[in-house]
UniProtKB/Swiss-Prot annotation:
This is Ni-sirohydrochlorin a,c-diamide reductive cyclase complex, component CfbD. Belongs to the NifD/NifK/NifE/NifN family. GO terms for biological process: methanogenesis. Pfam families: Oxidored_nitro (PF00148). Gene3D superfamilies: Nitrogenase molybdenum iron protein domain. Keywords: ATP-binding, Iron, Iron-sulfur, Ligase, Metal-binding, Methanogenesis, Nucleotide-binding. Involved in the biosynthesis of the unique nickel-containing tetrapyrrole coenzyme F430, the prosthetic group of methyl-coenzyme M reductase (MCR), which plays a key role in methanogenesis and anaerobic methane oxidation. Catalyzes both the six-electron reduction of the tetrahydroporphyrin ring system and the gamma-lactamization of the c-acetamide side chain of Ni-sirohydrochlorin a,c-diamide to yield 15,17(3)-seco-F430-17(3)-acid (seco-F430), the last intermediate in the biosynthesis of the coenzyme F430. The keyword Iron applies. The gene is cfbD. It comes from Methanosarcina barkeri (strain Fusaro / DSM 804). Its EC number is 6.3.3.7.
Length: 370
């Protein structure tokens, strides 16, 4: 018998926003939102920090009744005039999709001399990964990605949804947000373990650009271990394969690899690409079973709940997420410390190098007192 779908009552990520971020990863120059002026304002503004122009047709009550075709045609032409883009994305919103706007007709009428990725999406999907899938389907139709990459991305989206429903913020009707454990206490514990000569895994399983801050945790643990003379007791794992993912995602992996090397941090095990966070945990589990089953502790950053507990359940686990609703599920899985990098996402947009994390900064300061 199929499991009954739970009715989640805490706010969930938007498919519209997911489509916007996917267009960013495809390196569009302009993203046009066909909807009201305030739709997805926060994320649209943040994406401008990441190097793309986000504009809106600004549909009003009159357009909700009579349509916004002409506005979209005009904005496509205006975007070409202002920004001289090489690739344009257009994203639907709830009103434009409800009234049945034909975005493709507007593209045909404007006839820009550049490829256009049209994403017919609204926010009424239970899984925000629908927005990603629709954007990728349109990118495939436009010849921006090939069928092999599309199928790879589709598989990753299915696994990401599965992970969230099993162990993440979609695993129950309501999860209260939490700031997690005190970072000072967790830092003290990591330092104590290092001082005692315990063997530790430092695992980064990060989602795309969030890796710019989660990589700092890897960096900080290694810096402290080196200062204590126990760096050889650490094994670093990270999902930073620069050959995998959409263009922007591969670039993130290159930059993080560069910065870790510059600081003398060796990544002993590459566990996947930066979009493979839903499946990299299986690779981690296999590696631990084969080579690292006798290790004492693990510092896991990014998406810790995607790493199966089977081969880490006997280790002391210190995990760092950027999801306030992820604290309780991780605690219930068996993670002793769960920390939240609450302002991570805004700080990792528009950057091209590792950004200091709260836990990394805390660990460095506490180590000075040790």
């Amino acid at each position: 018998m199929a499991e009954k779908e739970i009715s989640i009552i805490h706010p969930r990520p938007s498919s519209i926003v997911a489509a916007l971020y996917t267009l960013r990863d495809l390196n569009v120059d302009v993203a046009i939102m066909h909807g009201p002026p305030g739709c997805s304002f926060k994320h649209a503004r943040l994406l401008e920090e990441d190097g793309i122009h986000v504009v809106t047709t600004g549909l009003d009550e009159n357009n909700f009744v009579f349509g916004g075709h002409d506005k979209l045609v005009q904005l496509i032409n205006k975007s070409v005039e202002l920004f001289n883009p090489k690739l344009i994305g257009i994203v639907g919103t709830c009103p434009s999709m409800i009234i049945g706007e034909e975005m493709h007709d507007a593209v045909l009428e404007a006839n820009p001399d550049v490829p256009v990725i049209e994403v017919e999406v609204h926010a009424g999907y239970h899984d925000n990964t629908k927005g990603v899938l629709f954007a990728l389907e349109s990118a495939l139709d436009a010849g921006i990605i090939d069928h092999k990459e599309f199928e790879r991305q589709k598989y990753l989206l299915e696994k990401a949804t599965e992970v969230e429903k099993k162990f993440g913020a979609a695993s129950r009707e309501y999860l209260a947000p939490s700031r997690g454990d005190v970072k000072y206490k967790a830092a003290q514990r990591v330092i104590q373990l290092l001082k005692e000569g315990k063997k530790g895994l430092v695992i980064m399983n990060a989602k795309k650009e969030t890796g710019y801050m989660f990589a700092d945790i890897t960096l900080a643990v290694n810096e402290v271990a080196e200062a204590l003379g126990n760096k050889e007791n650490l094994i670093n794992m990270a999902n930073i394969d620069p050959e995998l993912g959409l263009p922007r995602v591969r670039q993130h992996a290159e930059y993080i690899t560069r910065d870790l090397k510059a600081h003398g941090v060796e990544v002993h095990e590459i566990i996947g690409g930066m979009d493979e966070y839903p499946i990299a945990g299986e690779k981690v589990s296999e590696l631990i079973k084969e080579k690292y089953s006798d290790f004492d502790f693990a510092v896991i950053s990014g998406v810790p709940h995607a790493i199966p507990m089977e081969n880490i359940k006997n280790m002391e686990l210190i995990s760092i997420t950027n999801g306030p609703r992820q604290v309780l599920p991780l605690k219930e899985m068996g993670h002793e410390y769960v920390l939240v990098e609450i302002d991570l996402h805004p700080k990792t947009l528009g950057v091209s190098g590792i950004v200091e994390s709260e836990f990394g900064a805390t660990l460095r300061e506490v180590a000075k007192e040790a």
